[in-house]
Amino acid sequence: MFVCRMPMPQPTLPTESLAYALQRAAQALESVQKGMALPQALAQATTQCPPPARAAAQDLAYRSVRRLGSSRALLAVLVKPALQARVRDILLCALALLQDAAEDAAYTEFTVVDQAVEAIAAQRRTVAAKGLANAVLRRFLRERETLMAQIASQPEARWNYPAWWIDTVRAAYPDEWQALLEAGDSRGPMTLRVNTRRVSVAEMQAKLSLAGMESEVIGPVALRLAQAVPVERLPGFADGWVSVQDAGAQLAAPLVLGENPRAGMRVLDACAAPGGKTGHLLEMADVQVTALESDRTRVPRIYENLERLGLAADVRIGDAGTPSKWSGGGWDGVPFDRILADVPCSAAGIVRRHPDIRWLRRADDIPALVAEQQRILLALWDTLAVGGELIYATCSIFPSENEAQAQWFERVRTDAVRLDAPGQLLMTPGGAHDGFYYARFQKR
């Protein structure tokens, strides 16, 4: 006689539970480890999530990516056999939470262990590992100090960066490398740029205060919030009163335009998406801005930002290094008075906002980026008017992309005169800005 056994139904986790958020965060973490950027990985993993669950999964995923080096090292000590990818990633997320517990106890340790086991038990393909998961996490809690000391000798575990990244920063900044790595592992502040065409800085600060949001003036039009909030809660955001932009990035537009920008001046914002610097240029002066972006999927963001701010630019699609192929018939041959060359780079200076960058980048990416930056610089220089200025900008802290590039450009372009500029800006723990680099050249 044959007995037909129906498969046990798969448990459904409440969307408000930590177990549910752990599943979604683990899915995103798996994608990051396969090479996908964290925002895209989260978008895929949380498509069907209600907003509170999406926010919880996002918080977990960002924590997990920031602690990926130490969590991987811990798991290698705690579990010898290879784990299923989903079991591994739920445990990595749980270990990140437990490591953060001392300084930021988002959940009790008991809750983390219990809900991690629930997340594993709720999936048919992983349920067999629930006992192992329970044992692994409880052992970590019992032996935390010993285990953390055991992995501390591994640079990737100690600093939560790839070894090549640590070596690069240490070589470039022998006296500051530890502070730089720590700063990159922190959470950056939420900084606003006030659109003074719509409202003064003092008025905006007062409106924020009335809405229960404390802020500090940290630049000519920069307000740093004491606590980050969703943008839709910002007074006047939909009406273009403010934009979210790091204080370091807010240096670009004033550097491009100078103290007395001429009305109608032709300005090229190369590599313009999502349009933050384009908007700032137009907020500051009545200039003609061409916003160029090579990735057509990012161009809608430029239009969205300009529409919200009530501003307009000539938006083009194309590679900054091939002006003849820009959309709209290519460059029209009329030289630009100012060019902002915010070139593709490693993004090593904004790692505290994008912690996945450290794990997605490879050491051999840097020479390729350096070559691309040089190609773009040379091409854009040919579109600059005599007497005009080009600002070279990156969001990197690696000297090969920054000062080395500025010195190279001075050597190969004898018609380039280097002018004063901020140079290298470094992030610091609790600092007001991310890592940026600015160099300025005038064409003679």
Q: What is each residue range found by the language model?
A:
Residues 1-444:
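S-adenosylmethionine
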